[in-house]
Curated annotation (Swiss-Prot):
Regions that span the bilayer: none
Major location category of this protein: cytoplasm
Transport is among the record's keywords: no
Organism (species): Francisella tularensis subsp. mediasiatica (strain FSC147)
UniProt-recorded name of the protein: Nucleoid-associated protein FTM_1023
NCBIfam families: DNA_YbaB_EbfC (TIGR00103)
Alphabetical keyword list: Cytoplasm, DNA-binding
Assembly notes: Homodimer.
Entry's Gene Ontology cellular component terms: bacterial nucleoid; cytosol
HAMAP family referenced in this protein's UniProt entry, alphabetically: DNA_YbaB_EbfC
Function: Binds to DNA and alters its conformation. May be involved in regulation of gene expression, nucleoid organization and DNA protection.
C-alpha cells in the first residue's frame, strides 16, 4: 500500500476549508418560521438568534395563551428550518468523500 502523507494533508486542508465555508453559510442564513397560517412569523438566523417576531393585528384580541402558543409554534418552526437547512453531518460525509476519505456511517457529529 502506497501512503502519501502530503496528499492526506492536502485533503484534510481542503475538507477544513469546505467545513469553514459551510459554517459561514449557516451563520449567514435566515429562515422564517410561522404558525397560525402565517399570522405569527419569526425570523431566525442560522445561529438560532431570533431577529424579529411579527404578530398579525387580528390576534391582538385573542386570549394570551393562544398567542403564546402561536409564538412558541413559530419559533419551533424556525428552529426546524435552521436544522433542515444545516445538514452538518451529511456535509461532512460529502466533504470527506470529495477529499477521498471514507468515513464509517453512523457517526454523530457534535456540531449539528
Amino acid at each position: 500500500m502506497n501512503f502519501d502523507m502530503s496528499k492526506l494533508v492536502q485533503q484534510a486542508q481542503k475538507m477544513q476549508e469546505q467545513m469553514k465555508k459551510a459554517q459561514q453559510e449557516r451563520e449567514n442564513m435566515e429562515v422564517i418560521g410561522e404558525s397560525g397560517a402565517g399570522l405569527v412569523t419569526v425570523t431566525m438566523t442560522g445561529k438560532y438568534d431570533v431577529k424579529s417576531v411579527s404578530i398579525d393585528n387580528s390576534l391582538m384580541s385573542e386570549d394570551k395563551e393562544i398567542l403564546e402558543d402561536l409564538i412558541a409554534a413559530a419559533v419551533n418552526s424556525a428552529v426546524k428550518k435552521v436544522e433542515e437547512n444545516s445538514t452538518a453531518s451529511s456535509d461532512i460525509y460529502k466533504m470527506a468523500k470529495d477529499a477521498g476519505i471514507d468515513l464509517p456511517s453512523g457517526i454523530n457529529f457534535p456540531f449539528k
